[in-house]
Amino acid sequence: MGRISRADILPIGLETAARNLLHSCGTLRGMSTPISLFDRPGVEALRKELRLDPTVIRRLRVDLLKHFVPDAEGLASFPAPDRLALHTLSLYHRSDSEIDGATKLLLKTATGMLIESVILRVASGRTALCVSSQVGCAAACDFCATGKMGIARNLSSAEILDQLLIAGQLLASEGRKIRNIVFMGMGEPFHNEENLYTTIESLTAPDLFHHPPTKLLVSSVGVADAMVRCARRFPTVNLALSLHSVRQEVREQLIPLARTYPLDQLREAVREVNALTRSPVMIEYLMLAGRNDSLDDARELSDWVSGLRVHVNLIPYTPIDESPHLVGSDKPTREAFSSQLKAAGIDTTLRYSLGQDIAAACGQLVRHENRKRAMGSSESSRP
């Protein structure tokens, strides 16, 4: 990947000013601000203004949001293409793994901030898309590169949806379709809760993407009350909890947010989610040598999930420069841990992490230059 300049990520104050300037310039010139394709009321108002038959908009959405045709093809029969904004993001760079089916998309917002999405092509033929919900992340997990850069801002619903549109168009050219969408990219989804819910509504809406809610997965480091709210509002959407330890002191070392949401509160949240939904909650467990990977840890995890409807996903750790003190468990340790859980009757999967050669694996969703720039901005803004 080409080197990213320091101008590629803007501090939040500069980004806000840039957004306001863009809006002001359009207003001063008397220009009509293009309507986002995802803005249903706005598109309907535009249709009435242009006196278009409803089938024109319906066909446009089918072509772009269900078949993912190229922009020019999708807009070919639309009489005022300059009045519609198909994208809020632009593709800045694409990196394809040479060892597996992962593709990292580096995307730029209208004001120059960078986010990432990752396409995961599984050997079985299934394709998943990992999307970001924020620029950076406030959770500050010790094992995560994104958390080390701090938080710049939330992504809008249109910016989250555009990750799917861009990736879908890319995959359509390969004859592939996105089957699963996982909110496991940059950011804690429940720190952007309302935009997350708006996004889910658009993803599943019959007149937009019409993506099955059962093929959506929202992963959280443990915002307990929001997990329950999400399950109540979207009972067929899957939820995942990044647990990583059932020892409170260890979890607090790995995930500072654990001080706000202790383990007993998380367990109660999983129990409530189980009562509201049919699918098990995925328990994500990063395997760290000497931290959480002993057979005693496995037994304690078995006890913690006992009586809950869960599926444990054991994840190999991908090292990051900022946390040299963390080391991933070796394969025999991971396998012994998995066997211990299975012997206790716990549904368990040993996950293989894709995209490590292109820094696309979970925890690597920001390049070193991005992290350095973001952390520098954070330090300079402190009193």
Residue positions per predicted region:
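Short linear Ser/Thr-Pro motifs
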Residues: 95-97, 132-133, 219-220, 242
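P-loop NTP-binding catalytic core
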Residues: 111-121, 125
